[in-house]
């Protein structure tokens, strides 16, 4: 499928379109004409209508939310937060990219809520990474909370813990020192915790 004109400079959009095209073709056997039309749409009102109309497929809502988000339209916020917490990590990556571009002041609070929701711990990786990228006041407290939980014996979500360790090192806040020191004996997190401790300010 030819890339829609005007978006080739956005590799994340191109990657999303390729992924969704394969997904739709695998599920439906062919690509509906509406897919190409939506991929080329830039009108914010048309995109918002697609985002809010009942019965729209997930691929259409994802394209519309992404387009609105990177254009700075706050009407994309709720849809992008839902996609950030999706079980499909590729959708989460795309949503996180759009949320950063959106720069909505609600994003950090929403990401912190998703990251610290223990019932969704398996899907917290992208919210954790987003918090580190945002460098918001909510970032360090949320990452500390999540990492403390991931240090429990037998916890299966060590990749989330690793993202917390790396994020806290990137943020460089000395408030993270205690939890990073607690992570040093962890067999999967210890080396990363050592590196992050070296990055802390103060």
Question: Locations of the language-model features?
Answer:
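Short inter-helical turns and helix N-cap capping residues of alpha-solenoid HEAT/ARM repeat scaffolds
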Residues: 55-57, 87-88, 119-120, 157, ...
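Conserved hydrophobic register position within alpha-solenoid helical repeats
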Residues: 31-34, 64, 95, 127, ...
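Alpha-helical segment of the N-proximal tetratricopeptide repeat
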Residues: 28-40, 49, 56, 60-70
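HEAT-repeat alpha-solenoid elements in large eukaryotic scaffold proteins
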Residues: 17-28
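Residue-level detector of extended alpha-helical repeat arrays and alpha-solenoid scaffolds
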Residues: 28-31, 61, 92, 124, ...
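Core register positions within helices of long alpha-helical scaffolds
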Residues: 34-37, 67, 98-101, 130, ...
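Extended alpha-helical scaffolding segments
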Residues: 157-183
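Amphipathic alpha-helical scaffolding segments comprising HEAT/armadillo-like alpha-solenoid repeats
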Residues: 4-18, 39-53, 73-85, 104-117, ...
